[in-house]
A protein has these predicted regions:
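Acyltransferase
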Residues: 3-84
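Glycine-rich, charge-dense phosphate/pyrophosphate-binding loop(s)
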Residues: 47-137
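A generic structural signal for short, non-catalytic loop/turn and secondary-structure boundary residues
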Residues: 1-2, 117
Length: 137
């Protein structure tokens, strides 16, 4: 949907895929796996339709985020600053350490300053929406 704004937050450290996978439990209850699948579908529908309510439900991740957020000491503060300032959502991108914010407006300059003052160095990049989709180069 054309209304979405995407902001990535790139800290000055990496989280290896091995470390990010190693922190996850060996298995999950079926109910958690089913809930996560439903949330992913809500996220996709919310993004396609511009529906903030659906992306808020869709961001609920019980498979990865509760564990991987512990590898990112800044995550809770960043999430609070981003979501308060933009009324959007913040997610861990892949295994981390990059996070992505999805909202209908970009961060204010005041919020950007607060974020750059968090633990470590965090680069903030506002990304344009790509309407072309996936392609082979």
């Amino acid at each position: 949907h054309l209304d979405w704004k995407f902001t990535v937050f790139i800290p000055d450290f990496e989280v290896s895929t091995e470390k990010a996978r190693g922190i996850l439990p060996q298995g999950y209850p079926r109910s958690e796996a089913a809930a996560n699948t439903a949330h992913a579908i809500m996220m996709l529908k919310g993004l396609a339709d511009g529906n903030e309510r659906l992306i808020r439900h869709g961001k609920k991740d019980c498979i990865h985020e509760p564990y991987r957020r512990t590898l990112l000491p800044f995550f809770d503060s960043l999430q609070n600053l981003f979501e308060t300032d933009t009324d959007g959502i913040l997610l861990i991108s892949g295994s981390g350490s990059t996070c992505i914010g999805i909202s209908k407006k970009y961060l204010s300059e005041q919020a950007k300053q607060k974020i750059t003052g968090l633990e470590g160095s965090i680069s903030i990049r506002e990304l344009p929406l790509c309407l072309k989709g996936a392609s082979v180069l």
